[in-house]
Structure formats: structure tokens, C-alpha cells
């Protein structure tokens, strides 16, 4: 993305917001990692768990009530570690990577909801809305950059997600080896863009003259994203749901135990889905040694 932006002022404008969004996300996690280390969060949690174990083991009643809670939480996280990369790379490399994939996913939904051909007026209005959405999409779209992104993101997914969780689409890529030791993701991406109706505004607008779900479902971009997504839904999402339910149940019990152990301690609630009030002074801040950020950007 950066290489393309540096090569052409037009591309720089097209991708400025996308690049900034990706950069902010990357910096956000760098900041989080630094904060966790600086605040010694892990050490504090270990200390709290050890304190809880000592308190719990002091009576049979507590052991009966809370005896398995920490082990159950640990086991749930161990199981989650086996599938967490799948969801992470599904979101970041597939749904938020090459734009052609998610665009095909959205358009499939829009086309499948089109009014019947018998109702020409309503159908025409719906198609016009899709055209407007497409014009907005292609205004800031460069197929050369997106093709490179598709290749890079598929390769990243392939080598970071366990092979037993790979979607059937990766078997197609493996079958392209032709004697080479390294998989050719560039070749696969090139063929997707060569044959997809979503790789250019001209091809997509031609498709809208006679849109059909069947055409989309045979499109290589749509087949790529759905192969990976369906594999996740069938094999991973159910496991993840069970793990989350276990963690929710065990964490609730653990917090109840902590509150019982420290009755005078004040505990703050989970802020998600709550109303919040922000107050204070507008100003810059110092996130690290000799680093100062103003409250505005230029």
C-alpha cells in the first residue's frame, strides 16, 4: 500500500485514510503491549491469583465452591489458543485485507435481496443504489495494489493459521506448485483479478446490466472469501462459542470469589455497552519518556 502511495499522488490520496487506519491500529497494539509491560499487568494478575488460591485453600467450603475455577479458566484459554489465530487472520487478513473480497461479500448480499424481475421499478431503484455504492468504492480503489494485498494476505493467513484449519481454497493454491517449493500466491491473486467481475468498475457495471447471484457465486473473489469464511463457521465458531461461554461462567465465579475475599475493595464494572461521562481538561499527553503529543494534529 505504502509503495503504491509513494509512486503516485492520486493513489496517495485514494489510500491515505485506509493507510492511516491500518497504521493507527498497528500503533494501538504497540501502545497496548508497552502499557501492559510498563504497568506489570501480568505480574499483578499472577499475584492476585496466588492470593486467591491461598484464601480459597484455607477452608473446605471455599475449595468446594471455587476449587476448579482457575484451572477451568486456564484450560479454556489453552483451547482458545488453538483457534485464536484463525479468527484473528480471518478478520485482519481476509475481511480487512484485499478490498475485493469483502466487496464481493457485500454485493452478494445486495444482489440476493433484489426485488423480482417482475417488479421492474423497485428492482431498478435497488440496482441504482448498488451502482452508487460501487462508484463510491471504485473512486478510491486501485486494482494493482489490491492484487498485491490479496497475495500478501493469503500468504500471511496460510503460514499463521494451523494447516488443519485451512479452507479448501488453499488446496487450489497448493495444487499450483508445479514443482516449486514455495507456494505462488501471486499467481493465484493474478488469476482472481483476471477473472473477477469485481476487479474493475467497468466489469462490475457491465455485470449490473443483468445481475445474478449465480454469477457472483462462481466469481473467484467471492469463492475465495466464502471458502475461508465457511471453514471458520463450520469448524471454529462453535468451538469459540463454547469457550466464550465457559470463560463467561468461570470469570463470573472468579470475580464473585475475589469480591468475597476482598469485601472492602471497590471494583469497577466492565465499561462495554455502558453510558460514560468524560470530564477534565483538553491538553496533550506524555505516553513515554521524552515523548509529547499535542491535543491537535497538523
Segments predicted by a language model, with ranges:
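Terminal presequence/propeptide segments associated with secretion/organelle targeting
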Residues: 1-298
Amino acid at each position: 500500500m505504502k509503495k503504491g502511495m509513494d509512486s503516485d499522488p492520486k493513489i496517495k490520496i485514494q489510500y491515505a485514510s485506509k493507510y492511516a487506519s491500518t497504521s493507527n491500529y498497528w500503533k494501538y497494539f504497540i501502545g497496548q503491549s508497552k502499557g501492559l509491560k510498563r504497568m506489570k499487568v501480568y505480574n499483578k494478575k499472577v499475584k492476585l491469583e496466588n492470593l486467591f488460591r491461598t484464601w480459597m485453600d484455607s477452608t473446605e467450603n471455599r475449595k468446594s465452591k471455587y476449587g476448579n475455577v482457575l484451572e477451568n479458566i486456564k484450560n479454556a484459554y489453552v483451547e482458545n489458543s488453538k483457534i485464536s489465530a484463525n479468527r484473528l487472520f480471518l478478520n485482519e487478513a481476509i475481511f480487512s485485507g484485499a478490498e475485493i473480497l469483502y466487496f464481493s461479500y457485500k454485493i452478494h448480499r445486495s444482489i440476493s435481496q433484489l426485488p423480482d424481475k417482475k417488479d421492474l421499478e423497485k428492482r431498478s431503484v435497488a440496482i441504482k443504489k448498488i451502482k452508487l455504492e460501487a462508484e463510491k468504492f471504485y473512486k478510491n480503489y486501485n486494482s494493482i495494489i489490491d492484487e498485491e494485498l490479496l497475495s500478501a494476505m493469503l500468504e500471511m493467513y496460510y503460514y499463521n493459521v494451523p494447516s488443519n484449519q485451512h479452507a479448501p481454497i488453499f488446496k487450489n493454491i497448493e495444487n499450483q506448485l508445479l514443482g516449486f517449493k514455495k507456494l505462488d500466491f501471486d499467481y493465484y491473486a493474478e488469476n482472481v483479478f483476471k477473472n473477477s467481475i469485481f476487479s474493475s468498475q467497468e466489469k462490475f457495471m457491465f455485470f449490473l446490466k443483468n445481475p445474478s447471484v449465480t454469477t457472483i457465486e462462481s466469481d473467484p473473489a467471492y469463492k475465495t472469501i466464502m471458502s475461508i469464511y465457511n471453514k471458520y463457521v463450520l469448524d471454529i465458531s462453535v468451538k469459540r462459542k463454547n469457550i466464550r461461554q465457559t470463560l463467561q461462567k468461570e470469570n463470573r465465579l472468579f470475580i464473585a470469589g475475589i469480591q468475597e475475599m476482598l469485601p472492602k475493595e471497590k471494583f469497577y464494572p466492565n465499561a462495554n455497552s455502558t453510558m460514560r461521562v468524560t470530564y477534565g481538561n483538553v491538553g496533550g499527553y506524555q505516553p513515554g519518556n521524552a515523548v509529547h503529543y499535542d491535543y491537535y494534529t497538523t
